[in-house]
Amino acid sequence: RRLSEAGLATRIVFLIYVDLLWPPLEQTIVNKDRFVLMFAPIVRTYSETFEAGDTLPELPPFERNKLAFPKSVDANVAFLKAWQAIFDGDSFDFDYHLMWDHSNDPGHMQIARTIAADMQGLGKIGLNGYVSCQIQRIFLPTGLAMTVMGRTLWNAATDFDAVADDYFRSAFGADGPACRDYLERVSGLFDPVYIRGEKEWVDAEQAQRFAR
């Protein structure tokens, strides 16, 4: 109110993050045009992608200093939807695909696919944009993940395989298809889902993949 009285058009970003995942029970935002919601699902899994599921889990109760934060995408989106029920202003995703999870995928092919699907899914879950919290030196083995991110944010109808084929041809010339096949194999053999700890540690099939 004081900003409005002073004639200031300053906008304020507020976070849905850690303890603030839980929406308020009593307070409300009066001037939605003043505020922008930032969804920051820092403990989410990258084995799943953003979708607007028909059935979402109920929110667990808020218990100060005893909180368990959601890992599944559905559980994180459930918190987002609870906030959207009381705030329908502008919003964006602040996410961490290339902050650390790329380390679980040495080939970067599976995380690149997740990024593409998440960029396409932003509108489906009611978000208007994306800010990437990431390291800057993210181009080993390739810059595909960044390329996919940029192109799919620009056009949500972008086809992942078309971008990947174009990228590898542009970067490696006639060897592009072979380079892509190699990195697809690296991603598959390491199995990011396993490295994230989302499968049993003792896994004979995974041991065989590592042996290759």
Sequence positions of predicted segments:
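Catalytic-core regions of glycoside hydrolase
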Residues: 1-165, 171, 209
